[in-house]
């Protein structure tokens, strides 16, 4: 299962908006819950939230407080969608000075999203691809 989503940070509401790319792109955005939310990492959104989701199939962990477990940081330039690169590998080559992997999560949460908000981030990060997940997909009608 894969879905192409365009991510936008809404700092006023402290949410990450995920908008579908493709024929269903006219649907409403799905805001990721704030980090302080009480949802578990494997929980699915409530039935009232499901009607707001523009995609037909999403993993059950999609709306968890920690984000979807299947978020594979694969990115592509909007102009050349067929040439994707693995964001983790791509970024690791630029961050060789990081002392440990324990800094990766705080970096994503603080530094990367701050750069995104300021508009100083590389345009290759405009598209993320949701990849394989151990959770089952939920059908949205």
From Swiss-Prot:
Residues 33-48 have a biased composition (Low complexity). Residues 68-113 are annotated as: Mitochondrial targeting sequence. May form homodimer. May interact with host CEBPA, CFLAR, CREB1, DDB1, E4F1, HBXIP, HSPD1/HSP60, NFKBIA, POLR2E and SMAD4. Interacts with host SMC5-SMC6 complex and induces its degradation. Interacts with host TRPC4AP; leading to prevent ubiquitination of TRPC4AP. Interacts with host PLSCR1; this interaction promotes ubiquitination and degradation of HBx and impairs HBx-mediated cell proliferation. A fraction may be phosphorylated in insect cells and HepG2 cells, a human hepatoblastoma cell line. Phosphorylated in vitro by host protein kinase C or mitogen-activated protein kinase. N-acetylated in insect cells. Keywords: Activation of host NF-kappa-B by virus, Activator, Apoptosis, Host cytoplasm, Host G2/M cell cycle arrest by virus, Host mitochondrion, Host nucleus, Host-virus interaction, Modulation of host cell cycle by virus, Transcription, Transcription regulation. InterPro entries: Transactivation_prot_X. Belongs to the orthohepadnavirus protein X family. One of its GO terms (biological process) is symbiont-mediated arrest of host cell cycle during G2/M transition. The gene is X. The keyword Coiled coil does not apply. Its main location: host cell. One of its GO terms (cellular component) is host cell nucleus. This is Protein X. Disulfide bonds: none annotated. The keyword Cell cycle does not apply. It is found in: Host cytoplasm; Host nucleus; Host mitochondrion. Residues 22-52 are annotated as: Disordered. Multifunctional protein that plays a role in silencing host antiviral defenses and promoting viral transcription. Does not seem to be essential for HBV infection. May be directly involved in development of cirrhosis and liver cancer (hepatocellular carcinoma). Most of cytosolic activities involve modulation of cytosolic calcium. The effect on apoptosis is controversial depending on the cell types in which the studies have been conducted. May induce apoptosis by localizing in mitochondria and causing loss of mitochondrial membrane potential.
